[in-house]
Amino acid sequence: MKILFLADANSIHTIKWVESLHKHELNILVFSLFKPTDDVVQKYQNWGIPLISADLQSKIRNLRVPNISKLNYLTAFRLLKKTMNAFEPDIIHAHYASSYGVLGYLSKFKPFILSVWGSDVYDFPQKNQLNKWLLKKVIHSANTVCSTSEAMKAVIATQFDRFDVKVIPFGVDANVFAPASESPDQFTVGTIKSIEAHNGIDCLLDAANIIINEYHNTYIHFLIVGQGSLLGEMKQKTTDLGLDNYVKFTGYIPHEKIVEFHQKLSVFISVSTRESFGVAVLEAAACGVPAITSNVGGLPEVNQNNYTGYVIPPNDPEKLANSIFKLFKDKNLKDQMEENARDHVTKQFNWNKNV
């Protein structure tokens, strides 16, 4: 069977799907709007998977267009049609509705599978009515729509009148994401998120301030991984709160280092104000790390309150600080949640089963 993937070749989620389906001896070609990095190209070559790139970023830059709009995506459509004619796919599978999904819709190819990822459903249609109209067209053009969470499936039903969505969560390879052989030397609270307003980094810093400066606990440290438009502002806030000795920002880390990051943690934090799924929570859980998450989007599906961690309202640093402190004070509770977290992932979110 020939499957044409319309997806960002650089995305770790695309890479995982392609590698796993390739192991099932499916014939796959990846069509990416943007140029893949050299290491990604090498991975696809090692698997013997052809990769076509529209290199849209370079073309837009050469045309001196200030940003990439949906109209700019149409410049890649001619290359896509040429690719389809040469490859003759049996199935087209587009990942991310508001870009690759648009190309799948325009191709008029059937069968067409659409996988929605999050911001394509939560953010893109909220910008204007044209976006919402376009996304509804894309969603209804697909033979099958796949969502990573029940929460996002509900949004697609209520906002776009598509009710037969299949839920296939992002899974975790528990052989790769596994507990460290030894416990961490210090109690470290961590998160891996883009440093943007909706991801609750400011809430985490406020909770750190409560723990350090109000609870007077100097044994808990904080590790924040990621980059984004608010990184400088969050670093300055850390300094202003007098937390520089307790909070470390690492910036971006490559995916192959994420296991090592999780294994350093005592507690993982994800207190976003919106979240389609929460794969990082599952990766932490597979490493035996309990989580504290907000009760939004798909997060309650991956983190069970009082079992694998705590589920709290977003923007509530007092509750976040209190939940962290509970796990710090009660080692037996933390040990049990570590065991529960690992068990939950291996039984409910096994990557091979999801594939």
For the regions a protein language model found, what residue spans apply to each?
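A short, well-ordered alpha-helix in the C-terminal region of glycosyltransferases
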Residues: 319, 326, 333-348, 354
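Carbohydrate-associated surface elements
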Residues: 151, 171
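Short alpha-helical donor nucleotide-sugar binding micro-motif in glycosyltransferases
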Residues: 252-253, 260-265
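Conserved acidic donor-binding segment of nucleotide-sugar-dependent glycosyltransferases
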Residues: 305-306, 310-317, 326-331
